[in-house]
Amino acid sequence: MPIKKEREYRALAAPLTAQSATKLIQTEYYVEGYATTFDAPYLLYEFEDGTKIYERIDAHALDGADMSDVIMQYDHEGRVFARQSNKTLILQLDYKGLKVAADLGKTDLARGLYQDIEAGMINKMSWAFSVAEERYDRETHTRTILKIKKVYDVSAVSIP
């Protein structure tokens, strides 16, 4: 994954699936999942001495964030599999987090990614973003992201 200096990347253990009772996009190559969830602290890092650093995304962190023409990639690398501008990617904020719905039927490579997701070979998500405002609680070792400046991409990932 090419790391960009101004961006942060987070993977989420929430599932990315090819099954859904209610589709946001009508296509046979439909996938959905969550790029992030709100108000649920997760382990960000553990030091050798056992000190654990946690992070949580505030429920209002994405309010007003730049989410113009976000793309969907695999492992945050180069190839675009879906994007907002051609309506093959929908990002939806709900009570749980940032929901992602995508149509992976427009290209052979996108259909290949769909097949990997459907087979359970790829089943997690990640996202790339920049932070505008944050807070750190030294007592609980928890970083709270209060405001996201921009969302760059959401990605299906092999290893979260």
Model segments located where?
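Signature of dsDNA virion morphogenesis modules
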Residues: 1-160
